[in-house]
Amino acid sequence: MNNLVIDLTHGGVKISVSLKKKGENVYAYDIYGTLKSADMQMLEAYGVELLEDLSDLAGFEGDLKIIYPVHLPLTSDEISKNNPDLNYTFLTHHEAVCEILEDWGDDIPVVEVTGVKGKTSSVFMLKEIMISENPLILSSLGAILYENGREIILKKNISITPANIKETIDLAYKIANPVCKIAEGIVEGENLRKYSSAIFESSLGVSGVGDVGLLTNISENYSIAKKKSTASQAKRQVFRCPNVACEKEAYDKYYSDVEHTGLNTF
């Protein structure tokens, strides 16, 4: 199946390269025209082909998986009209990250945090609770690894776009395996892992890789995707986690239609 990753501004480059490393056939579309030359060179090095415009889909055949951010200002109909004969599957960036990480994290507790306010403070309260488990953290304050109580800054200036969950995991891998050749897939180190838990803050929903999804609140249900969607609709993805902790006011107002066996409200 062909994969088309839309939006190379908010983590699409990482998603494209990660899919390519898994042997997928990947195309990418820089909808905002912000692709940096270094990122373009990386995509070219991995064999990711860039589309000039969605009208290029007219030359495609068969199945096509569209991977898009939840704030994309295009509907599925607006995309598929470029070639109505294709068999489309649509995945959010969040869902794509979960698929990319399908073989990661089964043996450790993982918490994903989303919401309008209180995400970062919730992450660091959870860090204090889980500190004995050497948590790996992605938050708006950076990608951080805690090892025996010692804070290791992996990257300071990193956004909480879902693709940076994979980036944070990769950064921690490099710390644990300094002599490995990741790009070639040849590991010379011992493939050690320095963390025993993970806490990931994510904007506009969660990937579903977490054992627990925490929704702090919907204090403001702002519009996204050029008013075609809202914050509450995007953050509905929290219910993809097997266990969910959701602020009761948010649940009652926006998600009362959701039946989830692992739901707890607060």
Predicted regions and their residues:
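Flexible, charged surface loops at secondary-structure boundaries
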Residues: 1, 20-21, 44-45, 57-64, ...
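Short, basic phosphate-binding NTP loop
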Residues: 1-112
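Short, hydrophobic beta-strand segments that form beta-sheet elements in well-ordered domains
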Residues: 5, 25-30, 50-51, 65-68, ...
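Active-site regions of enzymes building and remodeling cell-envelope glycoconjugates
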Residues: 23-26, 39-53, 80-91, 135, ...
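Residues in the short beta-alpha loop(s) of Rossmann-like NAD(P)-binding domains
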Residues: 32-34, 141, 250
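Walker A (P-loop) phosphate-binding motif
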Residues: 97-143, 149-150
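Conserved nucleotide-sensing/catalytic segment adjacent to the nucleotide-binding pocket
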Residues: 149-211, 215
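Acidic, Mg2+-coordinating active-site environments of NTP-dependent enzymes
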Residues: 187-201, 205-266
